[in-house]
């Protein structure tokens, strides 16, 4: 999917260093110093020289192992952490220049946040938990109740408005957390490993629910996970982090097919590429195929029967009815056979 227009979030050369005098240290830091070099100097580089954009309506998944800097980076995006160097713009505003009042307004009106710990108020019902941020805004009881009921229905909890958190399953509690963050109708949605505490079946269910909501709402989303399969399933683009730096930021197809570092390649070794790679990525522009085209959005796995039974060497690929090129059937078969 291609996203047009100005980015909603734009980070340039962002650093977040922890230590005694991080600003002074960064001023004297020599180019090329590694994470371990910085640690040897008595500092921790939570984020190292990160530059990336998040487009409107895009779901950017930030992935990495524990300690890679993914949560620190997202906290910089919302200015829960003050950055040590560089700049971050949100909707065209340099957030480091905002007053405390303006920053609070930005968070209240444009940003929704969901974390691994649900953070529900145990003495409040589902309805009152979801309405809580609207109450903090000062909205009247009727207005906030109406909005809370809308998002409770949206996340599939209609009929449980009067339940208390202790009466809900883990997946249902996380749905309440998602509904609460949606109640303020945020433009930007930050989710920090929201499903990692759930068992695998509920986690898959919540991923399905999340994709359904995103298809309906089209939010700008920054989603953190340490699970590569989850990243591949949800992302428009994936940024893989290590030691505070972004190793590669690209579409799931490109990361699986063309990892740019050995570190990224390790994540892709056990991945069933046929499940991830789409015909549109394999299509060679300007190459002419014969016969009925396949859809650009179809994965190699979805095309398995055709690839095995078809006799064409070059198969046309169409995106929204327009032929964009042709894929080499043997190349696609190689991907399919390696997955089997």
Swiss-Prot record:
Quote the SUPFAM superfamilies the UniProt record gives. Answer: P-loop containing nucleoside triphosphate hydrolases (SSF52540)
What biological function has been recorded for the protein in this entry? Part of the ABC transporter complex TmoXWV involved in trimethylamine N-oxide (TMAO) import. Responsible for energy coupling to the transport system. Is specific for TMAO and essential for TMAO metabolism.
One of the Pfam families matching this protein, by short name:
ABC_tran
Q: Which GO terms describe its cellular component?
A: plasma membrane
Single GO MF annotation: ATP hydrolysis activity
What is the name listed in the Swiss-Prot or TrEMBL entry for this protein?
Trimethylamine N-oxide transport system ATP-binding protein TmoW
Membrane topology per the record?
Peripheral membrane protein
Q: Which GO terms describe its biological process?
A: glycine betaine transport
Q: Which InterPro entries match?
A: AAA+_ATPase, ABC_osmolyte_uptake_ATP-bind, ABC_transporter-like_ATP-bd, ABC_transporter-like_CS, Gly-betaine_transp_ATP-bd, P-loop_NTPase
Return the Gene3D superfamilies for the record.
P-loop containing nucleotide triphosphate hydrolases
Give the multimer and partner information: The complex is probably composed of two ATP-binding proteins (TmoW), two transmembrane proteins (TmoV) and a solute-binding protein (TmoX).
């Amino acid at each position: 999917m291609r996203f047009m227009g100005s980015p909603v979030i734009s980070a340039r050369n962002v650093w977040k260093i922890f230590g005694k005098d991080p600003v002074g240290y960064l001023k004297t830091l020599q180019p090329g110093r590694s994470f371990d070099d910085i640690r040897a100097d008595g500092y921790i580089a939570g984020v190292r020289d990160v530059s990336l954009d998040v487009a409107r309506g895009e779901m950017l998944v930030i992935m990495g192992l524990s300690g890679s800097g993914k949560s620190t980076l997202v906290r910089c995006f919302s200015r829960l952490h003050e950055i040590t160097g560089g700049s971050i713009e949100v909707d065209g505003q340099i957030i480091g220049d905002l007053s405390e009042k303006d920053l609070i307004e930005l968070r209240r009106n444009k940003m929704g946040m969901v974390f691994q710990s649900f953070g529900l108020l145990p003495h409040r019902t589902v309805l009152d938990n979801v309405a809580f941020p609207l109450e903090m805004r000062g909205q009247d009881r009727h207005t906030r109740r109406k909005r809370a009921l809308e998002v409770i229905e949206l996340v599939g909890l209609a009929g449980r408005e009067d339940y208390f958190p202790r009466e809900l399953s883990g997946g249902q509690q996380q749905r309440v957390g998602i509904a609460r963050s949606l109640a303020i109708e945020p433009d930007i949605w930050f989710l920090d490993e929201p499903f990692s505490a759930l068992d695998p079946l509920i986690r898959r269910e919540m991923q399905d629910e999340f994709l359904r909501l995103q298809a309906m709402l089209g939010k700008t989303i920054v989603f953190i996970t340490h699970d590569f399969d989850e990243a591949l399933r949800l992302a428009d683009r994936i940024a893989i982090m290590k030691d505070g730096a972004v190793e590669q930021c690209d579409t799931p197809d490109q990361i699986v097919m063309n990892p740019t570092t050995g570190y990224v390649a390790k994540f892709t070794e056990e991945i069933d590429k046929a499940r991830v790679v789409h015909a549109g990525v394999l299509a060679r522009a300007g190459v002419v195929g014969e016969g009925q085209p396949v859809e650009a959005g179809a994965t190699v796995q979805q095309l398995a029967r055709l690839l095995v039974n078809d006799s064409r060497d070059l198969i046309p690929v169409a995106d929204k009815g327009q032929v964009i090129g042709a894929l080499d059937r043997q190349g696609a078969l190689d991907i399919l056979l390696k997955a089997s």
